């Protein structure tokens, strides 16, 4: 199912690229899948990564969406849970949100606004998923379903665009 998710999340950008942008750029460059070039100092890059991982750990602690699949496995479940988070969900989300949606919004509205808009859309997508899965929604869970993914989406967009010259590989 992980490979299928990556294919589906890549198909939408690919079809748009084929229809409208094929003559302008290579598909992988167009969505940000290229070797990153660091634009800032190691100190700034490290600070950004530490903040992102703090948000990621907080969301992992709060969220039961992924961890519930592995909760009966004990410590053995940590590795598959991380694989699901980083490979299946991470790659799919990066291609669609930072690589496709984010890059189009940045091209139209600039880096600051484009990064913020893709982050908010990323947060709303998590609320839509929670509603589709009939997960409980209350004010405290809104932090888990919207605010944390929005902050994470903003941080990842910032890391990609401001630190690594638009490459989505670091995120």
Question: Which sequence ranges carry the predicted segments?
Answer:
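Membrane-interface helix/loop boundary segments of multi-pass membrane proteins
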Residues: 92-119, 160-166
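Interfacial helix-capping/hinge residues at the ends of transmembrane alpha-helices
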Residues: 28, 98, 102, 153-157
């Amino acid at each position: 199912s992980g490979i299928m998710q990556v294919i589906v999340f890549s198909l939408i950008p690919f079809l748009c690229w084929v229809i409208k942008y094929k003559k302008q750029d290579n598909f992988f460059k167009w969505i940000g899948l290229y070797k990153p070039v660091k634009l800032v100092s190691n100190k700034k890059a490290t600070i950004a990564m530490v903040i992102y991982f703090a948000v990621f750990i907080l969301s992992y602690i709060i969220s039961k969406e992924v961890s519930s699949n592995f909760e009966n496995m004990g410590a053995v479940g940590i590795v598959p849970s991380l694989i699901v988070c980083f490979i299946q969900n991470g790659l799919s989300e990066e291609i669609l949100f930072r690589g496709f949606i984010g890059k189009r919004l940045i091209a139209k509205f600039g880096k600051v606004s484009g990064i913020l808009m893709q982050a908010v859309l990323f947060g709303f997508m998590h609320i839509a998923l929670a509603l589709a899965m009939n997960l409980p929604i209350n004010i405290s869970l809104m932090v888990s379903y919207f605010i944390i993914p929005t902050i994470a989406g903003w941080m990842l967009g910032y890391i990609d665009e401001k630190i690594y010259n638009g490459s989505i590989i670091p995120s």
